[in-house]
Amino acid sequence: MKVLLKTIIAVAGVCFLLSAVSIRQSTPWVAPASADTIQNPLAGNVASVDSGKKLYNKYCVVCHGSKGMGDGIAAAGLNPKPANHTSEAVQKQTDGAIFWKLTTGRPPMAGYAKTFNETQRWQLVNYMRALKAPDKSK
């Protein structure tokens, strides 16, 4: 009887932990409101888009894919799945929110505050803006 009780408690504990992880991973990633006030010092800088593309192709495509659709070769094994940078959900975020996410990260994505300097992170933001989905109404 004691073995059965211990087994039930152990299974219940594992189920609880798995459900907690699942809930966290399905929670939308929202930057704090303060991130919306961060201004992009490179907004409109065409050269920064090219620089961001080089960084993106070296560091981001493995998860986010070459077109930013979240379909890189590593994406299948990740939970939560990588963001689709062409999506309306990403594109409607402020530059500051995207910059904050690049800086801080959230598992499985690392934060890049130490990998990229501030200018490089803004270059990535500008390149991600260039990835927006084509307008289908035209």
Which residue ranges define each predicted feature?
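Extracytoplasmic electron-transfer domains, predominantly the class I c-type cytochrome c fold
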Residues: 79-131
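Electrostatic cytochrome c docking/interface patches
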Residues: 26-55
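Signal peptide cleavage region of secreted peptide precursors
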Residues: 20-25
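Short, non-ligating residues that shape and space the ligands of small metal-coordination modules
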Residues: 69-70, 118
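Short, flexible, mixed-charge acidic loops at enzyme active sites
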Residues: 28-30, 73-78
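Bacterial N-terminal signal peptides that target proteins for export
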Residues: 1-11
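Sequence/structural segment immediately N-terminal to covalent heme-attachment motifs in c-type
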Residues: 46-69, 75, 98-104
